């Protein structure tokens, strides 16, 4: 079972270098956002937003709003800096304990799903955040083996 306290400690430790070590594939991200129907006027819930790696992508698509949530205080701090002066609101907290009643057009879980201890519960909670016709998008840019190797290396730095 994944311990949320360990997840917080790990990502707090990694936060300062996260963006410089991030490997982005813009074409893949564009496809993910296209498939999720993220576009003009859309209200997005960005779950486990990290340092805000998708913020610029949302802004390019002229979304109406983004509510970004991360459980790591250090990740959320960096994300808040990136969000200043935009329609992005960053919340530091456990998304499973927050209440958003059917407000969002899209709920995006990018590069984070394996870090949640109860995936079924998470999906149930996130489904309740969506308006009728809204989309829950769960995507990861790396395989499980690559994710584990990446995190093992990051933890040892």
Predicted regions and their residues:
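Class I SAM-dependent methyltransferase SAM/SAH-binding core
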Residues: 45, 51-97
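A conserved beta-strand element that flanks and buttresses the S-adenosyl-L-methionine
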Residues: 108
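Conserved class I S-adenosyl-L-methionine
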Residues: 1-39, 53-57, 137-157
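Short glycine-centered segments of the SAM/dcSAM-binding site in methyltransferase folds
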Residues: 43, 134-135
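A short glycine-rich, Lys/Arg-flanked "PGG" loop and its adjoining helix->strand segment in the class I
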Residues: 120-132
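Short catalytic micro-motifs in class I SAM-dependent methyltransferases
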Residues: 111-112
């Amino acid at each position: 079972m994944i311990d949320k306290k360990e997840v917080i400690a790990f990502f707090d430790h990694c936060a300062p270098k996260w963006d410089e070590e991030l490997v982005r594939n813009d074409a893949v991200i564009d496809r993910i956002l296209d498939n999720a129907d993220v576009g003009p006027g859309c209200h997005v819930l960005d779950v486990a937003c990290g340092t805000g790696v998708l913020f610029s992508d949302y802004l390019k698509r002229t979304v109406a709003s983004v509510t970004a949530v991360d459980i790591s205080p250090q990740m959320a701090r960096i994300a808040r800096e990136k969000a200043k002066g935009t329609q992005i609101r960053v919340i530091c907290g456990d998304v499973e304990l927050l209440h958003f009643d059917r407000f969002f057009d899209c709920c995006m879980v990018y590069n984070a799903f394996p870090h949640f201890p109860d995936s079924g519960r998470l999906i149930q909670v996130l489904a309740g955040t969506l308006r009728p016709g809204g989309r829950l998008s769960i995507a990861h840019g790396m395989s499980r083996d690559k994710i584990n190797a990446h995190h093992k290396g990051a933890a040892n730095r």
